[in-house]
Amino acid sequence: MLSGLVTALRTLTVLPVPGRDAERFSSSLYWFPVVGLVIGGIVVLFARAGMGAGWPELAAVLALLGGFILTRGLHADGLADLADGFFGGRNREAALRIMKDPNVGSFGSLALIGVMLFKWICLLELARAGAYGMIAAGVVLSRTAQVLLAARMPYARSEGGTATAFVEDAGWPHLLVASVSGVVLLFVLLDWQVVPSSILLFGSVVALFFVGWLSHRKIGGITGDVLGACSELVEIAVWFVAALWLKGLFSAIA
């Protein structure tokens, strides 16, 4: 079972991890929320370092860059490929072909710039408020969302791809375990506060369903790039609604 954790850490981070990979890569999906907690914890350390210097803007930059470096920019690369393929391809075949191109096009560049700016703004607000649990929660929920997509949507490429080994055996057990783990970690990180936890969960679900709907419409399934893009967009959605919560825009339901 721990071999799944090894595979999840090696897949989602640059951390050097001893041990053997899982025989079935899909078993690593059980551990995605836990690895999200590890990544989120490190991102929080970067944010705290910046705040320790009395510089919220630096805290947001350190958290942003720390997250990208820790994950090799893997998910950001997936988002760029998705943007190029989905908005630059006229049909399913063209979209899949463009997504496989290692070069980043105009749509991908715009997506990356937009993501970095949006993340920086949200992280700045969260760091200023000392809402470190919300920062970590965004990372946990984004990795949980990847499991839900992998478990419920087919792989789009008939010839397979880099994420095939993770998706082909994924099913309800992975979805249920990851969902429960992700929600429990969310509530722990937010000190069992029901309203803010529910708001963050709602934001993640909206982003998840949007990515799933768009991917089904454009290519009829998912790829590794879609899973990466899902992580980025869910993370942003969670941090955004968290920032709105801190600004009192959900006070009517508190």
UniProtKB/Swiss-Prot annotation:
Domain of life according to the entry: Bacteria
Coiled-coil regions, chain positions: none
Keywords annotated in UniProt: Cell inner membrane, Cell membrane, Cobalamin biosynthesis, Magnesium, Membrane, Transferase, Transmembrane, Transmembrane helix
Disulfide bridge positions per record: none
Transmembrane segment boundaries: 27-47, 50-70, 104-124, 131-151, 170-190, 194-214, 233-253
Cofactor(s) listed: Mg(2+)
Protein name: Adenosylcobinamide-GDP ribazoletransferase
Organism: Chlorobaculum parvum (strain DSM 263 / NCIMB 8327)
Encoding gene (name): cobS
